[in-house]
Amino acid sequence: RGLGDVYKRQIQEPEWFFSFRSHPFNPEAGSVGSPEVESMREMMTEQDLSGFPRKGFTRNYTWRYHKDLGYGDHLERYGEVKDIETYCKYAQVVNYDQYRSFMEGWASHMWDWYTGILIWKTQNPWTSLRGQMYDWSLDVNASLYGTRKGCEPLHAYYNPVTRKAGLLNTTLKDYTDLSIVARIYNLEGKLLWEKETRASAKANTVQELLDIPVPEGIKGAYFLRLALNADVPNIYWLTTEPKDYT
């Protein structure tokens, strides 16, 4: 239930998935999943939509009826949530980061803390606002893409607790001579730091390979780009300010 029976059903900090030890095999785990604004408008009137939660507090009966889970202050970290369009846009950013962190955090402890996990649930049989990757209208939200990225069979990832880049191999095949390139950019796209390492990966293993520095001369948000064998990169938005990405 939620992300596991040992804690409340609620959104978690990305770091939490790497540091909190839950059930070794969890067949029922999930998190937030608010859809995009088009689906929201199919559920509620504009008056009800204008009562969107602020800093995680549901202020409207209709939102409670549709089982709004709440995002805490995670949306406000990206700026002022001034209307329902902004609410849904920021929610997609958080949905992606939440589920990617979820998958990467658990996989980073595979065969040590965990043996497996199942997402519950991918969809709802009604117009609900929680625990879904596609909604009643069959519209996909960003939770699906975060899960898909975090579940890549051979995957470069970032651990926000150790501040290291690592390599996950959840396949049954050994790999050799792999290239991982880490790059840090500012918000204008200027390259601030770059490092490459080469590694091998045994089947069903995880390893941490690179220390990721905090870039000098940056205050606020910046990007970390991890590319494995020049494939589709894994991009993180990080910050020097506590939970402020504005």
Tell where the protein language model's regions lie, with residue ranges.
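Long, low-complexity segments enriched in small/aliphatic residues
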Residues: 8-9, 223
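Short, flexible loop/turn segments at beta-strand junctions in immunoglobulin-like
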Residues: 214-216
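Short beta-strand elements
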Residues: 231-246
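Glycine-rich, charged/polar anion/phosphate-binding loops
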Residues: 9-13, 210-212
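Substrate-binding clefts and catalytic carboxylate motifs of secreted carbohydrate-active enzymes
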Residues: 11-176, 181, 192
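Intrinsically disordered, low-complexity regions enriched in Ser/Pro/Gly/Gln/His and often acidic
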Residues: 9, 229-230
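Beta-strand-rich binding/interaction modules
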Residues: 163-201, 206-211, 220-229
